[in-house]
């Protein structure tokens, strides 16, 4: 058996799972006490100014009125909330943010999205018949890509 084959065959599913979940762990641990990237250096991002505000308002309306709000009255003279893609009403994977504590919910969702992308890249590379080690490297390269973290920092 070639040396490379032994190396890749020794990687088990738990190791693959850990490496694919590494981006999520990175974001969650980095932002354990607050936002992972919109920090005091860059406090004015879309995440802190719009997403956080929308989620907080939706959560308040769910607790007080037991319904999803269709209108957001605090910006200008009010804006439609149901048609605003930043509010996330129609994105099921963002719904945990309505019940989880903020900003932990944002860190968790961003981390899981990065891990989902890393898993997708890993599976794509495996489908292209690359080895396990090369596929893991590609998945991690995607999941830990600085450009994606820059997007998170910008909101």
Model segments located where?
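Transmembrane-helix signature of polytopic, membrane-embedded enzymes
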Residues: 122-144
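Membrane-interfacial loop-to-helix junctions in multi-pass inner-membrane proteins
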Residues: 6-14, 40-44, 126-133
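Start-transfer (signal-anchor) and selected internal transmembrane alpha helices
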Residues: 1-32
